[in-house]
């Protein structure tokens, strides 16, 4: 690998001169600049990004930590798309770090981005507790924002969706449409989002005077296959239901396929709704009713807050978003 010293020898200048040319700091004649750039091109030299970052006041980068167990869903591809696009609009490069499979690995991913001198960092945590995240924020000077988790101490550093209330509202709409027997497919139960959506389902039943039937709850893993498996589990139990709520659209699509294969008509016999309102939802047959989570607005808010902090702005109150049920063909009133 070519070094800066080798570039300097090729250009016939000092190493310090090469450094000034590449950093743009200090006066260097145009003739000398041309010789240095020619030497760089001929030698294939690439500056050490980490070394440059160590001395720079700003790297024009934003970091994002997401655990790889969340990569498979369409929801997260849309999240990453919006994060990269909005970072670009702010003149920043988005750097992604993998939180992998544990709180310790999420912590290591955050430290990796800090070591790269990212100007600010976003975290979409799966394993770190809110107390651990608060401690991380307190320990570092770079702005750190948390997506989809409500913090206790550093509440202004969180942008989140109230999944419990959003789930409550969606289930309440089903009840108000006449549904009394409502099945629920959870996501992975190590996910705070899944726990909150299940809690919202239970609260909606309780508030409307409907007894909780555990036979109507099946655990999934966010995937279409687990949605189909959840339906098979419900039917094998002999569960009777006129509506089914899946904790994301991937599972809802798998559930509709399983119902179709079992000869259960959607929505005539069972109405189905999901969460996230992914791009394919209007194009399934029947078109999937889904709770739209305002991902674009959440990303816009979190990046806006990070840039505001970098510009010296004072902290703002926490920002809470809520979802909205988009009714399509998969949802009708139950047949009498």
Swiss-Prot record:
Any one of the GO BP annotations = DNA-templated transcription
The family database entries (InterPro entries) matched by this protein are listed as: Cro/C1-type_HTH (IPR001387), HTH_LacI (IPR000843), LacI/GalR-like_sensor (IPR046335), Lambda_DNA-bd_dom_sf (IPR010982), Peripla_BP_I (IPR028082)
Give UniProt keywords alphabetically.
Answer: DNA-binding, Repressor, Transcription, Transcription regulation
Q: Does the keyword 4Fe-4S apply?
A: no
Matches recorded under SMART domains? HTH_LACI
Q: Name one GO molecular function term.
A: sequence-specific DNA binding
All residue ranges annotated as the HTH lacI-type domain in the record = 2-56
Q: Where are the transmembrane segments?
A: none
Note the DNA-binding span(s) on this chain.
4-23
Q: What does this protein do?
A: Repressor of the asc operon. The cryptic operon is activated by the insertion of IS186 into the ascG gene.
Q: What is this protein called?
A: HTH-type transcriptional regulator AscG
Q: Which organism is it from?
A: Escherichia coli (strain K12)
